[in-house]
C-alpha cells in the first residue's frame, strides 16, 4: 500500500469497512459514495435497499406465527450464524433457535439442535455456492435424529447459495433476506427466490 500511494498524484483516502449488521451495509454504501463523489447514486441504492428491507419486515409482521429457524453456517463442526444472519432471520419473521445478533458464529452440539426442534432449517455454509454447499448435506442427514426434526418432516430443510446471498455483506444480502422470508413464510411471500439460489434437503 505504501509503495502504491507513492505513485499516486494525491495521498489516498483509506476507508475501512467492517459491517456487522444490515444497517451497517447501508451506511457503508453511503460512505463509499461520499468518498468517491457518487453520493447521489449511493444514496439511491441505499434507499432502495432500505425500502426492500422495510417491505419484508412489514409483511412478515402480518403473521403471528414465528417459526423456529436453525441457520447453519458450517457442518463440521456445527456452527450457527450470528450477527447479521440472526438479524435476517428475525426480519424475515422467524426466531433463531441458536445465534445471537451481538456475537459471531456459535458452535453447536447436535443433541442441542434435536432438542430445539427447528421448524425451518437453512444450511448456508459460509462462502460456498449452491453446488459446493450441497456437498455438505450428507453430513447433516446422516446424524442421528435428523429425520425426526419438524423441519425435515414438513419438508422445510433447505440449502442456500451463501456465497451470493448470506456470507458477503453487500447489496445482495437484501436478496438473501427476501429468500429467507419466502422460505420462512411461504404463505406471505412469493417470487423472492432467484433461480439456482436454493435447494431442498
Whereabouts are the PLM-identified features?
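Acidic/His-rich segments in extracytoplasmic proteins that coordinate ligands and/or metal ions
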Residues: 1-35, 107-148
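Extracytoplasmic/secreted envelope proteins and their assembly/folding machinery
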Residues: 1-5, 26-29, 33, 43-46, ...
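Sec-exported extracytoplasmic/periplasmic mature domains
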Residues: 6-9, 34-38, 54, 58-61, ...
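Second-shell loop/turn segments in exported
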Residues: 12-19, 30-39, 74-76, 163-170
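Structural recognition of the beta-strand scaffold that forms the well-ordered cores
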Residues: 14-16, 68-71, 96-99, 121-124, ...
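Structured C-terminal subdomain patch of bacterial secreted/periplasmic proteins
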Residues: 24-34, 43, 128-201
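Basic- and aromatic-lined ligand-binding clefts that recognize polyanionic substrates
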Residues: 40-92, 165, 197-201
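His/Asp/Glu-enriched short active-site or ligand-binding loop at hydrolase and phosphoryl-transfer sites
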Residues: 82-105, 125
